[in-house]
């Protein structure tokens, strides 16, 4: 990168060797495909435990709101389509 003075910011050689060493080794790097798959599923379960699930009452409310909104949008699109149909028939006969 170039700063305001025009000098180039170069990483040190020590930083590069530390990064390379940090990527090597570790428990994750030595597991086979089945071990990585098991780790993946364990992480999924751990993340799903963090989810705050809605109560039955909240779920019913949200579902009702979505269905009402969809019905209103269907009605709106139907009215607009009917209006365009009448306008096209009026213009083109």
Curated annotation (Swiss-Prot):
<feature type="compositionally biased region" description="Basic residues">
    <location>
        <begin position="20"/>
        <end position="33"/>
    </location>
</feature>
<dbReference type="InterPro" id="IPR005807">
    <property type="entry name" value="SecE_bac"/>
</dbReference>
<keyword id="KW-1133">Transmembrane helix</keyword>
<keyword id="KW-0813">Transport</keyword>
<keyword id="KW-0472">Membrane</keyword>
<keyword id="KW-0812">Transmembrane</keyword>
<dbReference type="GO" id="GO:0009306">
    <property type="term" value="P:protein secretion"/>
</dbReference>
<feature type="transmembrane region" description="Helical">
    <location>
        <begin position="64"/>
        <end position="84"/>
    </location>
</feature>
<comment type="function">
    <text>Essential subunit of the Sec protein translocation channel SecYEG. Clamps together the 2 halves of SecY. May contact the channel plug during translocation.</text>
</comment>
<keyword id="KW-0811">Translocation</keyword>
<dbReference type="GO" id="GO:0065002">
    <property type="term" value="P:intracellular protein transmembrane transport"/>
</dbReference>
<feature type="region of interest" description="Disordered">
    <location>
        <begin position="1"/>
        <end position="33"/>
    </location>
</feature>
<dbReference type="Pfam" id="PF00584">
    <property type="entry name" value="SecE"/>
</dbReference>
<comment type="similarity">
    <text>Belongs to the SecE/SEC61-gamma family.</text>
</comment>
<protein>
    <recommendedName>
        <fullName>Protein translocase subunit SecE</fullName>
    </recommendedName>
</protein>
<dbReference type="GO" id="GO:0043952">
    <property type="term" value="P:protein transport by the Sec complex"/>
</dbReference>
<dbReference type="GO" id="GO:0006605">
    <property type="term" value="P:protein targeting"/>
</dbReference>
<keyword id="KW-1003">Cell membrane</keyword>
<dbReference type="GO" id="GO:0005886">
    <property type="term" value="C:plasma membrane"/>
</dbReference>
<keyword id="KW-0653">Protein transport</keyword>
<dbReference type="InterPro" id="IPR038379">
    <property type="entry name" value="SecE_sf"/>
</dbReference>
<dbReference type="GO" id="GO:0008320">
    <property type="term" value="F:protein transmembrane transporter activity"/>
</dbReference>
<comment type="subunit">
    <text>Component of the Sec protein translocase complex. Heterotrimer consisting of SecY, SecE and SecG subunits. The heterotrimers can form oligomers, although 1 heterotrimer is thought to be able to translocate proteins. Interacts with the ribosome. Interacts with SecDF, and other proteins may be involved. Interacts with SecA.</text>
</comment>
<dbReference type="InterPro" id="IPR001901">
    <property type="entry name" value="Translocase_SecE/Sec61-g"/>
</dbReference>
């Amino acid at each position: 990168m170039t700063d305001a003075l025009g000098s180039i910011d170069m990483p040190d050689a020590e930083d590069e060797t530390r990064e390379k060493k940090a990527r090597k080794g570790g428990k994750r790097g030595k597991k086979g495909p089945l071990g990585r798959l098991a780790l993946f599923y364990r992480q999924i379960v751990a993340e799903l435990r963090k989810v705050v699930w809605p109560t039955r009452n909240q779920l019913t409310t949200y579902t009702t709101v979505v269905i009402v909104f969809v019905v209103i949008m269907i009605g709106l699109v139907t009215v607009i389509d009917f209006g365009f149909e009448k306008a096209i028939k009026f213009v083109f006969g």
